[in-house]
Amino acid sequence: MSEAKRLAAEKAIEYVEDGMIVGVGTGSTVAYFIDALARIQHRIKGAVSSSEQSTARLKQHGIEVIELNHSGNLSLYVDGADECDANKCLIKGGGAALTREKIIAEASERFICIIDPSKQVPVLGRFPLPVEVIPMARSLVARQIRDMTGGQPTWREGVVTDNGNQILDIHNLQITDPEKLERELNQLPGVVCVGLFARRRADVVIVGGEPPVVL
């Protein structure tokens, strides 16, 4: 699948225009995009990064990393996904960067999602849904999510997000109405961010292959 990821990332470079500040996500597919972006870094002003991991890779290539507070709205955000349905709704957060990813997606005019074919699903939920929570609320939120959804929350023990929070992964979901579930989970006290990208879903999905498929 690494070749499919690389091909999707290379295709996404076609959406980068001169003078842009590019929003950059997190994960193994995005790493290929950062490497490809390095080849045209003379054409862009810099990048807004969604994680310390991506920031390190961008700086390794000499790409200037700009704070979102200083960049204003972005024309383009490129990120991967853990799952993608036919409506371009996503599950994200396997890399625990979901909150910053959602912030940058919200600030961007166009959200390009790059995936390999294994990430395409008819119904979201086979991949456990990540939820970032305030540490003191972890057990409370887990109980409330279990009662609300029937899913099985597990604590991603040992993982601390870049924001200092913890992650619950919700197993055994079949998410037939992603927007509704995203809205309901966001209302629980202690929830920082839900790894459903349905209200702000991808505008374009690129599925890696020979040739890549643009949805």
Curated annotation (Swiss-Prot):
The active site is at E101 (proton acceptor). The gene is rpiA. Belongs to the ribose 5-phosphate isomerase family. It comes from Stenotrophomonas maltophilia (strain K279a). GO terms for biological process: D-ribose metabolic process; pentose-phosphate shunt, non-oxidative branch. The keyword Isomerase applies. It catalyses: aldehydo-D-ribose 5-phosphate = D-ribulose 5-phosphate. It comes from the Bacteria. This is Ribose-5-phosphate isomerase A. GO terms for cellular component: cytosol. NCBIfam families: PRK00702.1, rpiA. Substrate binds at T26, G27, S28, T29, D79, G80, A81, D82, K92, G93, G94, G95, K119.
